Amino acid sequence: MEKLIVAEIVVTPIGTTKTGLSDYIAKALDEIKRAGVKYQLHPMGTVFEAADLETAFKITKACHQAVIKAGAKRVLTTLRLDERLDQPRTMEERVKRVMAKVK
């Protein structure tokens, strides 16, 4: 059976000279786009789909390094993984199933 990993990544540059982080986040998002995976940016992070753990880790590393390359002196990266083995469910399917139950 095909599996699908849904990952949420939050890359936070620390000790930058300005309060806005969009320049750094855009660099990380460029790496996710370059990987060619489906993703959704939200106000507090980014969710993406990966075929396997190696791909999820590779994307996470690329995002982390992109923020360092953009000038961050310290970076805090948080990764949450949901690997469902019985039935692959896309990001959209997961949201749709919950919203169908909201009254």
Which residues make up each language-model segment?
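Charge-rich, low-complexity N-terminal segments
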Residues: 1-103
